[in-house]
Amino acid sequence: MFIDWRQLPAATDALQWAGWIWRGTAVWDKGNSRPQKGRFRQQAEYIVWGSNGDMPINRPVPCLPGVFKYGNPQNRIHLTEKPLPLMRDVVKITEPGGHILDPFAGSGTTILAAVLEGYTATGIEVTGEYARRARERIEQELRQAA
């Protein structure tokens, strides 16, 4: 779950309240942001992650970095769209052959990243226009990758 600092306490509480185990937080460093004089730059989002069960230490997944440095994508479909290379890295926390659920699919980046990395995936998007555009994007990019 990608959030800014203001939602960090509520997001981690909600994850645990839903019965999941909060596993930690990573950082997406976007590199640049709108400067605010007299304040720290808001150039990062937090990645809150957890599991709905045990995660043995010997799982066949790589050790991922705690900070991911990727700029915002150009020509975004959705306001909060994430860069595809970032999501291709993040989905690797899932065991090989795993299934990835994105309940806020937006432009479909997580679903596309999951499929490109060999996972199955389900995306849920409540806004019809974004769902349509995400589906078209995923289909087009998968055709190009084939």
Stretches found by the model and what they are:
Residues M1-R132:
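Core catalytic lobe of class I
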Residues R135-A146:
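Short, conserved SAM-binding/catalytic segment
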